[in-house]
């Protein structure tokens, strides 16, 4: 018996059975318990979801922006009313501590929907005078049906981030959550329907990468928004272009640098570094896993980091006192342990952790100890590749020019941060760092108002912020002639 029973697809405002005849399992990563069997969508199911979305989108786009705004605000109210229920499901599905999901995942998702609900009425065109009796005006019109493909680390937050601007602009969305964490996207669909979103405007299809490929290549989908790894992102972009020149937004991986200068407040710097590496058990795309520390303060900084690592409370995710849970799956555990062994083999000095936790109740879950490596080099695998787990690499530097060059020596460019008391240096360094999301004397916050996205191979386009609405609309230009038409022939 599973905890949540059989999970179906959500199409046309309600649950429907998949036609594939296939299911997959989702497990609690803390206990190994079967949470649910989930029906996998077929090509016919994807077609049905897209057709339903087309029908719903026509009704949704015909509403006034104020009507759409009110409905989205109602969805926000429902998300907040059901915060505890949704957080409990998210904790079971992802392994995140309940204190984290209660305070972050649903809260930040609802904030983004509220933000775009407020902007729905601000989507405007321009009027451009040409001459006394002629002018041009522009309209921002919805794209139509968009596809959203989510990642497993922030299931409901990512679903909110992708749907909010799409729906605010009058689009519909067919969403595929990660098959590793498939549960809460269905709850979001229920909430949208209860709030008054027309049937079909938000549909959920379940499955692995093959279902994502069906969405990406579908001729009736106008845009794909994808969150995931770089190599998968390249495939998404290629298929989206080859199929119908779809617009794409992609938030991909990172290997982000955190630079601690010699004048930094060491307690603050250590707090930031620990948060930037061990929040959500290190499974955050923006984590600052390359920690560059000025040589003169490296030993003192490292000692403060290790003191804080000892205070991390690893435990059952459902316990309120826990602030560090398991990794999301056995596959992710194996990947992280492989990187740890690579770090040892390449000569990094293991300062903390480095092992799987197996004592007591840890034995049935996917737990790895918070891990810190010192004496790291830029050419090490743990320094160059995204691990997506709780592994910090500490590197030392001597000069600002040197550390900026080393920090930028990567094909990633998602995030970066500096810790310094010198405001001029802080801004100078940030302006030279090749990253789309940057922090000064802090780390990790991504409010609704802040555009989120990467440079280089860390992504295309942005999520959140006003600019994102531009990528869910298309501009129509209209010339109006009030005077006499002068024929050419």
Curated annotation (Swiss-Prot):
Cofactor binding description: Binds 2 potassium ions per subunit.
Residue(s) at site: Seems to be a necessary countercharge to the potassium cations: 247
Gene3D superfamilies: Aldehyde Dehydrogenase, Chain A, domain 1, Aldehyde Dehydrogenase, Chain A, domain 2
Catalytic activity: betaine aldehyde + NAD(+) + H2O = glycine betaine + NADH + 2 H(+)
Cofactor(s), by name: K(+)
Associated pathway: Amine and polyamine biosynthesis; betaine biosynthesis via choline pathway; betaine from betaine aldehyde: step 1/1
Active-site residue list: 162, 251, 285, 463
Binding site for K(+) 2: 245, 456, 459
Residues at which NAD(+) binds: 150-152, 176-179, 229-232, 253, 285, 386
Gene Ontology molecular-function annotations: betaine-aldehyde dehydrogenase (NAD+) activity; metal ion binding
Pfam families assigned: Aldedh
One BP annotation, GO: glycine betaine biosynthetic process from choline
Subunit organization: Dimer of dimers.
Cross-referenced PANTHER family: ALDEHYDE DEHYDROGENASE-RELATED (PTHR11699)
Role: Involved in the biosynthesis of the osmoprotectant glycine betaine. Catalyzes the irreversible oxidation of betaine aldehyde to the corresponding acid.
Protein name: Betaine aldehyde dehydrogenase
Species of origin: Burkholderia cenocepacia (strain HI2424)
């Amino acid at each position: 018996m599973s905890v949540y029973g059989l999970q179906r697809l959500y199409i046309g405002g309600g649950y429907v059975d998949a036609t594939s005849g296939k299911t997959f399992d989702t497990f609690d990563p803390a206990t190994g318990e079967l949470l649910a069997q989930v029906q996998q969508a077929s090509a016919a199911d994807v077609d049905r979801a897209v057709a339903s979305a087309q029908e719903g989108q026509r009704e949704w786009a015909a509403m006034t922006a104020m009507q759409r705004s009110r409905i989205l605000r109602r969805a926000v109210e429902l998300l907040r009313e059901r915060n505890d229920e949704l957080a409990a499901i998210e904790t079971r599905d992802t392994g995140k501590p309940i204190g984290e999901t209660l305070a972050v995942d649903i809260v930040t998702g609802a904030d983004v929907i509220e933000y775009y609900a407020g902007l729905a009425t601000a989507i405007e065109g321009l009027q451009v005078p040409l001459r006394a009796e002629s002018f041009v005006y522009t309209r921002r019109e919805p794209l139509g049906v968009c596809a959203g493909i989510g990642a497993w680390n922030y299931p409901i937050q990512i679903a909110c981030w992708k749907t909010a601007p799409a729906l605010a602009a009058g689009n519909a969305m067919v969403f595929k959550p990660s098959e590793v964490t498939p549960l809460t996207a269905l709850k979001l669909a229920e909430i949208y329907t209860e709030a008054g979103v027309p049937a079909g405007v938000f549909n959920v299809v379940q499955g692995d990468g093959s279902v994502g490929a069906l969405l990406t290549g579908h001729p009736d989908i106008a845009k794909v928004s994808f969150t995931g790894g770089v190599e998968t992102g390249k495939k998404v972009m290629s298929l989206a272009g080859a199929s119908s020149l779809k617009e794409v937004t992609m938030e991909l991986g990172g290997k982000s640098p955190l630079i601690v200068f010699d004048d930094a407040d060491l307690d603050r710097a250590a707090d930031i570094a620990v948060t930037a590496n061990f929040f959500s058990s290190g499974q955050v795309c923006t984590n600052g896993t390359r920690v560059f520390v000025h040589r003169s303060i490296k030993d003192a900084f490292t000692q403060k980091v290790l003191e804080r690592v000892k205070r991390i409370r690893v435990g059952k995710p459902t316990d309120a006192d826990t602030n560090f849970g398991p990794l999301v799956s056995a596959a992710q555990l194996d990947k992280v342990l492989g990187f740890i062994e690579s770090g040892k083999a390449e000569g990094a000095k293991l300062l903390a952790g480095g092992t799987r936790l197996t004592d007591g109740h840890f034995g049935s879950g996917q737990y790895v100890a918070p891990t810190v490596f010192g004496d790291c080099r830029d050419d090490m695998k743990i320094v160059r590749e995204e691990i997506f787990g709780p592994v910090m690499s500490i590197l030392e530097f001597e000069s600002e020019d040197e550390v900026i060059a080393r920090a930028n020596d990567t094909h990633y460019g998602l995030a970066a941060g500096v810790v310094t008391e010198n405001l001029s240096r802080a801004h100078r360094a940030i302006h030279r760092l090749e990253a789309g999301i940057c922090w000064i004397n802090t780390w990790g916050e991504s409010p609704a108002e802040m555009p989120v996205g990467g440079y280089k191979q860390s992504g295309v386009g942005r999520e959140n912020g006003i600019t994102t609405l531009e990528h869910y609309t298309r501009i129509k230009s209209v010339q109006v002639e009030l005077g006499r038409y002068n024929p050419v022939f």
